[in-house]
């Protein structure tokens, strides 16, 4: 039994998935969006809603949550169907349509599928400390939901990548004490962020703890009191008073059922034709970070472009007898779906 009938099933409700709703709507195609998370926004909302983004056209700075809100508002005229908290498990191909079945038994009939699942299902990489679970979601967090939660607190950031560096810069504005623990003296972040960190280190806004790694967490009832860190060169140990610990060691990606769909995968990404975003399977497309091709640049902006290309190609599947006459949105306006 079919529960929903639509033109396109979009797998993933992150920024690229939401923008796909808008792009398909501009071509008079309807979408049903499936996501394993219980809210719209993907990693942008789940992991870093207040993280500033600087490379969205026309926005000198915008938070991840604001970007999602704007994309949702932009796509509202096309009345998408969101199936949240569900995972697309199976795809069945028929002559004139596809069936997508979720882990909840929901069945959606569509004419094409666009996979916009980012890195797939994801989870944070935990610190290798025995009792870390006791503190998680109480005083150990893998994302920042509200910067104000850390106002006038003693905070430790662990990690040396972009997320650790970016949040160190932002949280230095509100914390009472900020430690940055890393195994190396160099950080893997953008040159601009690196310059900001150097300035904050010199001004004492951030206490740099290198080359150290976290050895032990001390506290009770989920409340962190102290963190013991160990120098990886000299074995010297330091005990630092900390209210909150933010480990940023990346996330582990899991493509889940996608691996069983007969789609060509390379390095946990879906191989596509860069001109159309088609996969090797008929009527199945992939856009955003989950897709790959020679010269691929992993940017939200790139995903937006891929979404537009995929939707324009799918138009010929949905409307095989109607030629697509390209029009700019200024002259076309918002069509009714």
From Swiss-Prot:
Keywords: FAD, Flavoprotein, NADP, Oxidoreductase. Binds 1 FAD per subunit. The keyword Nucleus does not apply. It is an enzyme of class 1 (oxidoreductase). FAD binds at residues 35, 43, 48, 88, 122, 289, 330. Its EC number is 1.18.1.2. Its cofactor is FAD. GO terms for molecular function: ferredoxin-NADP+ reductase activity; flavin adenine dinucleotide binding; NADP binding. The keyword Transport does not apply. InterPro entries: FAD/NAD-bd_sf (IPR036188), FAD/NAD-binding_dom (IPR023753), Fd--NADP_Rdtase_type_2 (IPR022890), Ferredoxin-NADP_redctase_2 (IPR050097). It catalyses: 2 reduced [2Fe-2S]-[ferredoxin] + NADP(+) + H(+) = 2 oxidized [2Fe-2S]-[ferredoxin] + NADPH. It comes from the Bacteria. Homodimer. Belongs to the ferredoxin--NADP reductase type 2 family. This is Ferredoxin--NADP reductase.
